[in-house]
């Protein structure tokens, strides 16, 4: 199918009976006919009140900026809480890729570039409850947060019009991992190790960045292209949530074959994702799930009490190392279950040939971008970061804590290097030091939480013009509608950046009409230019 929003061919978690998946052939047949698929309800965090719009001052220039920030008087969308936009003005919607309960996914073409993407159009009529809207917001927030990770389908943007909310994502032309499995029947150990490594990398990155996926299964991994060695891309974060310290999750979600025992017991955390990944690995190696029955209740009972079968064919011919990893991933006690980070170091995955492909994680990519920014842009991002709501920075606190291993409240050079290495980035000590110097705006020798937030702002946080307006007005002290040279020098002097060279660099880069000052249009262009993730 190739789109980044697949149909969900699962057994609903609450009712109904199901067929035993005795073989991959049976599963392929069941999947390939007219069996109805259901769309996952899109999901995201509770937003609360509409965004606050800052006072704009009395000048006509400031008033014009305020009108621009409110979308030029355009109607605000109730779901995304920003000015509504016609997605068809930006993208041409082409053939339908799939449809379901909440909407339809189309192949689409960006009018400005000709690039192809997948667009999921969610009907607002189906978002009847407040929780439905909250779910959509949470999914978008999580997709934005994970933007830039190599094994996660890239999120392009969300748009709202009168009838729909549209989510535009990377188009993955290679189809589903599920279809690749059913076509092959089973994988060689080396092939399975490569796939498992990609899946565990996704799990590790999600957990490191403060997200639990909660619906890992082969259908939710697409291949970037039809090539045999095409990378996997994780999709469908509609059931995902941000990790909250100390919170125990109780709602039963997921897909029957892949759900962890503690989920059925309504007492679980991020370890449930490891169980689901272990089930996928088991299927990769033998073609059938480790726990099955004729009914959903039977499957759940098997998950809770049955032992994993390693005695029937083909398991006697599969290496003990592979079986050891599966046992550790399918340990019934989540506290004794292997973590994603530990699993990636398991000897079976190492024996399978660890990938030597260099990875730029979203964290490293964003820090590199921050380092390359001019000083005004760095300070403007700091203003925006300080005004983001708790909902907008969910996940970032978990990322910061995962790097701040000694819980000092700051990230040292060594902690930064270790954290980037854990995310798969290969980086020299010299480059780490340069990143540290760029992100450490107050030159304290370490990165505090505010500085970390500033560097981690992704491109999607620059979509709301009220945030850009607030940042502009922070520097435009006299509400003239311009940032003058004196105002620029004053702002930069607070952080020891007010030397002539830095000021000249900013004006040369940003002041397009060369009038010696920066207007709002020039400021917005600077802020949105060059941020890729």
UniProtKB/Swiss-Prot annotation:
Keywords: ATP-binding, Calcium, Kinase, Lipoprotein, Membrane, Metal-binding, Myristate, Nucleotide-binding, Repeat, Serine/threonine-protein kinase, Stress response, Transferase. The keyword Lyase does not apply. This is Calcium-dependent protein kinase 12. Ca(2+) 2 binds at residues 440, 442, 444, 446, 451. Its EC number is 2.7.11.1. Activated by calcium. Autophosphorylation may play an important role in the regulation of the kinase activity. A lipid is attached at residue 2 (N-myristoyl glycine). SUPFAM superfamilies: EF-hand, Protein kinase-like (PK-like). Residues 354-384 are annotated as: Autoinhibitory domain. GO terms for biological process: defense response to fungus; intracellular signal transduction; positive regulation of response to salt stress. GO terms for molecular function: ATP binding; calcium ion binding; calcium-dependent protein serine/threonine kinase activity; calcium/calmodulin-dependent protein kinase activity; calmodulin binding; protein serine kinase activity. It is an enzyme of class 2 (transferase). May play a role in signal transduction pathways that involve calcium as a second messenger. Functions in signal transduction pathways that positively regulate responses to low-nitrogen. Functions in multiple signaling pathways, positively regulating salt tolerance and negatively modulating rice blast fungus resistance. May promote tolerance to salt stress by negatively regulating NADPH oxidase and positively regulating reactive oxygen species (ROS) scavengers. It catalyses: L-seryl-[protein] + ATP = O-phospho-L-seryl-[protein] + ADP + H(+); L-threonyl-[protein] + ATP = O-phospho-L-threonyl-[protein] + ADP + H(+). Plants over-expressing CPK12 show enhanced tolerance to low nitrogen stress. Plants over-expressing CPK12 show increased tolerance to salt stress, increased sensitivity to abscisic acid (ABA) and increased susceptibility to rice blast fungus (M.oryzae). The keyword Repeat applies. The active site is at residue 215.
